[in-house]
Amino acid sequence: MLGGRHSHWSPQDLEEQAFSPYGTFPPSPTESTETSSSISSTRPRVNPRIVSDAILGLSDGLTVPFALSAGLSALGNSRVVVVGGLAELVAGAISMGLGGYVGSRSEVESYEATVRETKHLVKASPMETMNIIHQVFAPYNLPEEPVARMSHILYNSPEKLLDFLLTFYHKESKPGCHQAWISAITLALGYFIGGFIPLIPYFMVDQVLVALYYSIGIMIFTLLVFGYVKTCVVRGWTGKENIVAGIKGGLQMVVVGGLAAGASIALARAINPTGGALF
């Protein structure tokens, strides 16, 4: 079936190996040593969802508040820029945080609904469940006998069967219990930190036009660095292609931020050409 030297394996052996995280058959001593050394040398990795939320929050924070502060600077009053910018920062951070929380809660609810439907399917339709298991193994062109035995083992273990269907058929992973709050806080902080950077010159310089120039210079550098880092986090840091892609990502962020700021300034000047008080 699976080779002569494995013909003495019992169903219990197959069941244990089916859920082994690193392979179907027991590793050799050399493989075990290599696996142990690779695991011990692996550094802890940041949750990809946290990285994604941080990038999203910073990306919006570096663009929208900068465009708003640049537009408000056309009014010629640094106090208006600071107050309006801070108000937008707080409102935007709260909005981003709530959006992240609601989105994560929706993922949890979707996962729980999938779990309920799968449990009902297992209890109500044994034959359909067995067919689904065979569908999962079908792309691998495995012999029928081991697939049938594995299906039987899975069906006799409800918890493992549920986990198998969720992972390999529905392709769903259980969300973290605190993921909604972590996502909300990460998005809100990313937005606030990113949006506060272009406001810094307005706290230090009294002349609005000078502060605007400082803000533009700071944001060009910040957007360039952020775009480069954001791209290289996804693609990698080494290699000519990755470096070129990182530079392109930085330039794209500068172009997007510049267009948003330019549109905001143009709109403010169109509404208030003199730069005086509106009311």
Swiss-Prot record:
Pfam families: VIT1. The keyword Membrane applies. It is found in: Vacuole membrane. Keywords: Ion transport, Iron, Iron transport, Membrane, Transmembrane, Transmembrane helix, Transport, Vacuole. Vacuolar iron transporter involved in the transfer of iron from the cytosol to the vacuole for intracellular iron storage. Plays an essential role in iron detoxification during high iron conditions. The gene is cccA. Disulfide bonds: none annotated. InterPro entries: Ccc1_fam. GO terms for biological process: intracellular manganese ion homeostasis; iron ion transport. Residues 30-44 have a biased composition (Low complexity). This is Vacuolar iron transporter cccA. It catalyses: Fe(2+)(in) = Fe(2+)(out). It is a multi-pass membrane protein. Residues 1-44 are annotated as: Disordered. Induction: Expression is repressed in iron starvation conditions and induced in high iron conditions and is controlled by the hapX and sreA iron acquisition regulators. PANTHER family: FE(2+)/MN(2+) TRANSPORTER PCL1. Belongs to the CCC1 family.
